[in-house]
Amino acid sequence: MKTMIVKATLLAGLVVGVAGAAWAQSAADAIAQRQAGFKAIGAATGEVKKALDAGGDLTAVAAKAAEISAYGKRIPALFPAGSGAVGGAKTRALPAIWENKSDFDANAGIMSREADKLEMALKANDKVAAAAAFAGTTGQCGACHRPARAPQ
């Protein structure tokens, strides 16, 4: 009986240890993935802005808006509970994200839909609509950054 209790205790400790390691890895992975993703959509946004400022053919950067939209759809999953600045993690994500997760997720969805509008305008080479959609997309980025991202 005593041996069974010891074995059960050791097994429970092993399960907790493995689960803890998996959680730490998944939190670190989430942080790394979202940082890489935000860097990529920042670059995509810059390319769209450059094309808008140049005033030429916009169709060449329509795929960049699609990248922004696709990433917007992934954002909610990249902010699982416990993936903030805990345990020395290097992230600018503020607790407000998880305190108001439904609002945060909704803002990501809005950003994605704004980027869809941007993609359509770019594909149509409609400079006026593209400029308006670009403002909508980047404005929505700011709607999340202000309450949810710590300054550098």
Task: Mark where each language-model region is.
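The canonical Cys-X-X-Cys-His
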Residues: 137-149
